[in-house]
Structure formats: structure tokens, C-alpha cells
Amino acid sequence: MDVTGIDAAKAGWVAVSIKDGQFSWTVASSLDEIECGTRTYIDMPVGLEENKRRSVDRLLREELKPGRTSCVFNAPLRTALEQPDYHTANDYSKQHAGFGLSKQAWYLLPKIEQVRTHYQPGWVESHPEVCFARLTGHPARHSKRTVEGVAERIALLQRYACPAYWELNVRGVATDDWIDACLLAIAATLPAVYVPADCPVDITGFPLYAALPKKITFTETV
């Protein structure tokens, strides 16, 4: 199976693909410029709720306890895509869903809208930090934006013979963007589980679930 992992970046999007065991990469300003694999994991909310928190966000945070839960933010309501400004969207979310809209989620709305506009069968939301936790047996011990955090993530990627794309100097793509895209691509090659397990969809038919690799136990090797 040919697979792709996609992460958002200042340049737009960074994609790492694996086909017949060979890695390749693409940096594009728009998702429609990326030739995606049959299975594509993307680090971005896809399905959005109308008036409540997404169950998938809660379940992903559970995977990162005790110290890395802040890596998963609450996705915005679908109606946030229609709001003219942050304050209006934030007030609407508080009134109709009981929680505010983070600035992080607000600034990602154009990316979320792009995912929903260009969505293809085989695309599914995933989360690189949770993929890391499942492939190592524990959440990362350090932030991916620290020297120590980069090192522990690279150590995992090297177990899968991943090329050192994070050493490339591509404008608008940070080291952690490369690492996240690589983690997602590798995760997509492995047997998948879905959270929530019943694979719900939102009112517009987009998936309200994430794909993750099956947990590797201490007796398994790569």
C-alpha cells in the first residue's frame, strides 16, 4: 500500500510518502498539489461537531496522559468556518457548546477548510504525538521543539529507515514539520485502529475519528 503523511507548515503543507518501501517528499502551498497515497494520514481536524466537543479530541488526549495532553487542542465547531472574526466565533462556541475557541484553533480554520474542500477517500485525521506514543509505548518525554525532543523522535524514525528530511533547508518548513509528516507516513504503513471505534461522521459526512497505529508491545520489534 502506498501511504502519505501530511502536516501543516508555514509554506502550506509538507507531505512524506512511502511507496514500495521508498520514501519521497513534497512541499506545496495547497493540498490539491500533493499526490497522496491510497491511505493518507493528516494532522488536522477533518470532521467538526455542531454544538459539542469532539469525542476524538478527548480520546487522543487520553493517549498522551499524564504530561502531553496539551498537544491536542479542541477542534472548532463547524459553524466557526462561517464566522466573520475570532470574537464572534468564540462567543458562539461558548453559547452553543459550552467551551471557548482557542486562538490556535481559529488560526487553523483556513487549513481545516482546505482539508474539507480537497478531501479525498482514504484521507483520515491522525496525530503524530499519539502515533509516537503508540510506537514507543509512552508519550514523548520532551517537546518536539527542543533539542531533546527532536532527538527522541528522530531515534524512532531511524528505526524505520526514514531519510533525514529534517536536515533539509526548505523555506517555510520547520524541523518538527518534517518529523510530524514522517511519523504520520510511517504510522500509515502499519495496521490501524480508529478512535472512536465506531467511526462517526459529522453532519456533512466528514470523518469525526482519527486513525492510529496499533500499539506495539515491549516484545515486538520494528
List the predicted regions and their residue ranges:
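Phosphate- and other anionic-substrate recognition elements at nucleic-acid/protein interfaces
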Residues: 1-4, 8-222
